[in-house]
Swiss-Prot record:
The gene is rpmE. Transmembrane segments: none annotated. Gene3D superfamilies: Ribosomal protein L31 (4.10.830.30). GO terms for molecular function: metal ion binding; rRNA binding; structural constituent of ribosome. Binds 1 zinc ion per subunit. One of its GO terms (cellular component) is ribosome. Belongs to the bacterial ribosomal protein bL31 family. Type A subfamily. This is Large ribosomal subunit protein bL31.
Amino acid sequence: MKTGIHPNYAEITATCTCGNIIKVNSTAGKNLHLDVCGACHPFYTGTQKVVDTGGRIDKFNKRFGMLGKK
């Protein structure tokens, strides 16, 4: 490997809005601010919401359902 061509590899901190602090190695060289992390993401915490699209389907069938029936 050639010397002097590789970027500096330093430890930085990634801070989440929930207060979780993660130390990682990076070539970016500056600290990161995250919106979500593994500690507060809805998928990992089990608090994810199910999107109910039933209202949209009912609205469609109400408007166009009679066209499919003979």
